[in-house]
């Protein structure tokens, strides 16, 4: 309002009309008046008259994927045709794929009395080839029937040497009681033995030699007489007269006296 008052004064600084037409507050300052609003499209709902109507949907939707190629059908062939279902099967009853499974027959009295693993039970191919307790049966068979009952593995059996092998081993033992590693490997290769067998033979041969030498020494030594400490003198028993010298005459001259036996009536 103050601005309008200043502009309305006749001042030489602002010649001509002071108020421009654009500063007016009337409706002429904003151009021609707006046309009147159109009547509402929905008379029952006047508040929604300003809402524009929705655009019409397209006439047809476009295909999201391209049509299948002809080479796929040529490569894999046409798919299996679906069987046409009859109206009766669709109306009532289960589908043909879900037919009820017949229940197995119940076990009779003979099957209940038969134990597990009997002759009627089918066995697997592995069980037919090998029984479950085969290793136990072998040990029982080896332990019974006149055998001592001691089970010995294959590695613990005594090695039987030939005459040629024993002769060569004895020659080597005559030169050296303890064989060297190099000579042991050479001797094992020449005789067809292992180094362990040669080593064990030399160990047993040395033990046998010690036993023989000990026995010879015991035979050569004469039996030693008993020493003075082993002989103990037994004291002589004193005579009866030495114990009681005054009673010796009585014992010599004493005679038995007759004893009369009287029996009362």
Curated annotation (Swiss-Prot):
The keyword Transmembrane helix belongs to this UniProt entry's keyword annotation: no
Region (Interaction with DNA): 157-178
Keywords recorded for this protein, A-Z: Activator, Developmental protein, DNA-binding, Homeobox, Nucleus, Transcription, Transcription regulation
GO cellular component term, pick one: nucleus
Subcellular location as annotated: Nucleus
Record region (Interaction with 5-mCpG DNA): 196-207
Comp. bias regions, Low complexity: 73-92, 110-126
Any GO MF annotation of the entry: RNA polymerase II transcription regulatory region sequence-specific DNA binding
Skewed-composition ranges (Pro residues): 30-43, 93-108
Region feature (Disordered): 9-152, 206-265
Composition bias type Polar residues, residue spans: 245-256
Annotation: DNA-binding region: 154-213
UniProt-listed PROSITE patterns: HOMEOBOX_1 (PS00027), HOMEOBOX_2 (PS50071)
GO annotation terms (biological process): animal organ morphogenesis; anterior/posterior axis specification; cell differentiation; positive regulation of transcription by RNA polymerase II; regulation of somitogenesis
InterPro entries linked to this entry: Caudal_activation_dom (IPR006820), Caudal_homeobox (IPR047152), HD (IPR001356), HD_metazoa (IPR020479), Homeobox_CS (IPR017970), Homeodomain-like_sf (IPR009057), HTH_motif (IPR000047)
Main location: nucleus
Described function: Plays a role in transcriptional regulation. Involved in activated KRAS-mediated transcriptional activation of PRKD1 in colorectal cancer (CRC) cells. Binds to the PRKD1 promoter in colorectal cancer (CRC) cells. Could play a role in the terminal differentiation of the intestine. Binds preferentially to methylated DNA.
Family the UniProt entry places it in: Belongs to the Caudal homeobox family.
Protein name: Homeobox protein CDX-1
Annotated source species: Pongo pygmaeus
Higher taxonomy: Eukaryota, Metazoa, Chordata, Craniata, Vertebrata
């Amino acid at each position: 309002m103050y601005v309008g008052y200043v502009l309305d004064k006749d001042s030489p600084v602002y010649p001509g009309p002071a108020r421009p037409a654009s500063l007016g507050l009337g409706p002429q300052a904003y151009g021609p008046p707006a046309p009147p609003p159109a009547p509402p499209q929905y008379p029952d709902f006047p508040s929604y008259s300003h809402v524009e109507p929705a655009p019409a949907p397209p006439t047809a939707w476009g295909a999201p994927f391209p049509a299948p190629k002809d080479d796929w059908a040529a490569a894999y062939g046409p798919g299996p045709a679906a069987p046409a279902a009859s109206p009766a099967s669709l109306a009532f009853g289960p589908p043909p794929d879900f037919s009820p499974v017949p229940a197995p027959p119940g076990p009779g009295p003979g099957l209940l009395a038969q134990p597990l693993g009997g002759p009627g039970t089918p066995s697997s191919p592995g069980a037919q080839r090998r029984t479950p307790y085969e290793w136990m049966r072998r040990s029982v068979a080896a332990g019974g029937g006149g055998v001592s009952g001691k089970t010995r593995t294959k590695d613990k059996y005594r090695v039987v040497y030939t005459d040629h092998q024993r002769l060569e081993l004895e020659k080597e033992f005559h030169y050296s009681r303890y064989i060297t590693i190099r000579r042991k490997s050479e001797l094992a290769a020449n005789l067809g033995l292992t180094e362990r067998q040669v080593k064990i033979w030399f160990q047993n041969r040395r033990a046998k030699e010690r036993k023989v030498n000990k026995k010879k020494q015991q035979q050569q030594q004469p039996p030693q007489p008993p020493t003075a400490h082993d002989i103990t003198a037994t004291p002589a028993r004193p005579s009866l007269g030495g114990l009681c010298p005054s009673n010796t005459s009585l014992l010599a001259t004493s005679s038995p006296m007759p004893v009369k036996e009287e029996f009362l009536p």
